[in-house]
C-alpha cells in the first residue's frame, strides 16, 4: 500500500524571510485524483503555488505542476508544467514511454533509465520510502527528468526529530533533497524537509534559502489522508 490515495488534499502556507521576519507570502496545495490514461489507472496529482497578490510586485509566482503516475508502480506517464516566476515563463509537456525508455517533450525525444521521476512525482515517490532501512547520513538515489535532461539526484536521510509548525507539533522524519538550481531555489543540499513519522509521510515543513532571503513552508490543513495522522503530538 502506498502512503497516499485518491482524494488526498494538503494545504500549505509559504512564509518569506529577508530581514529576519517571516511574512505570509503565498500558498500551495497538492491534490490527488483517480483517472485513466489509455485505459490505465493513474493518479492525477496537481501542485499549485501562488504568491499573495499583495507581494506580486516583488516577485509574482503562479505555478502549476501536474503528473499522471501509474497506480501500480508510481512511474510517471505524463508531466505538465506551467511556471510564472518573476519575469520567467515556461510551459512544458512530457510523455514517458517506459516500454521504450523514452521521454518526449515539445523539443524532442530523449532516452531515460528504467526508474525515472518528474519533479512532482518525485515528491510522492519520496513519501513511500521506508526510512527505517537507512542510517542517518545515508543517501537515497533517485533519477529525475527535468528540462529535457536526466539528473541523478538523491535524498539524504537526516534522522527523526520533533518539529513545531503553525499547525502543531509532530514526530517527524527529516531529509535533505539534492536540488537542481532553478529560478528560485539554489542547487545542492540546502533544503530541509520534515515529513510525518507515520504511514502518511505528509510534508509538514520545508525550509530553504532562495535567491534572495529564505522561505519556510508549513502544512496548514489536509483532507482524506490514507491513514490516521499518528505523528501528531499536539495542535489542531
Put a short name on every predicted segment.
Residues 1-96, 134-236:
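Acidic, serine/threonine-rich low-complexity disordered tracts
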Residues 88-131:
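Hydrophobic, well-structured mid-protein blocks that either form specific transmembrane helices
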Amino acid at each position: 500500500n502506498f502512503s497516499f490515495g485518491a482524494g488526498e488534499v494538503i494545504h500549505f502556507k509559504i512564509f518569506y524571510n529577508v530581514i529576519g521576519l517571516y511574512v505570509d507570502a503565498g500558498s500551495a496545495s497538492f491534490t490527488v485524483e483517480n483517472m485513466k490514461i489509455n485505459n490505465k489507472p493513474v493518479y492525477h496529482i496537481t501542485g499549485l503555488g501562488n504568491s499573495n497578490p499583495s507581494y506580486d510586485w516583488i516577485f509574482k509566482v503562479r505555478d502549476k505542476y501536474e503528473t499522471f503516475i501509474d497506480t501500480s508502480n508510481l512511474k510517471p506517464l505524463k508531466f505538465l508544467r506551467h511556471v510564472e516566476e518573476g519575469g520567467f515563463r515556461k510551459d512544458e509537456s512530457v510523455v514517458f514511454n517506459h516500454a521504450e525508455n523514452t521521454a518526449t517533450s515539445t523539443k524532442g525525444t530523449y532516452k531515460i533509465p528504467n526508474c525515472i521521476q518528474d519533479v512532482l512525482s518525485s515528491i510522492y515517490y519520496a513519501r513511500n520510502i521506508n526510512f527505517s532501512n537507512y542510517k542517518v547520513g545515508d543517501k537515497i538515489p533517485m533519477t529525475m527528468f527535468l528540462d529535457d535532461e536526466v539528473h541523478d539526484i538523491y535524498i539524504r536521510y537526516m534522522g527523526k526529530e520533533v518539529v513545531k509548525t503553525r499547525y502543531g507539533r509532530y514526530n517527524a522524519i527529516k531529509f535533505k533533497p539534492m536540488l537542481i538550481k532553478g529560478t528560485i531555489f539554489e542547487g545542492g543540499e540546502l533544503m530541509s524537509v520534515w515529513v510525518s513519522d507515520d504511514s502518511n509521510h505528509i510534508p509538514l515543513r520545508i525550509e530553504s534559502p532562495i535567491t534572495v532571503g529564505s522561505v519556510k513552508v508549513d502544512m496548514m490543513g489536509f483532507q482524506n489522508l490514507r491513514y490516521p495522522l499518528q505523528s501528531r503530538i499536539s495542535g489542531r
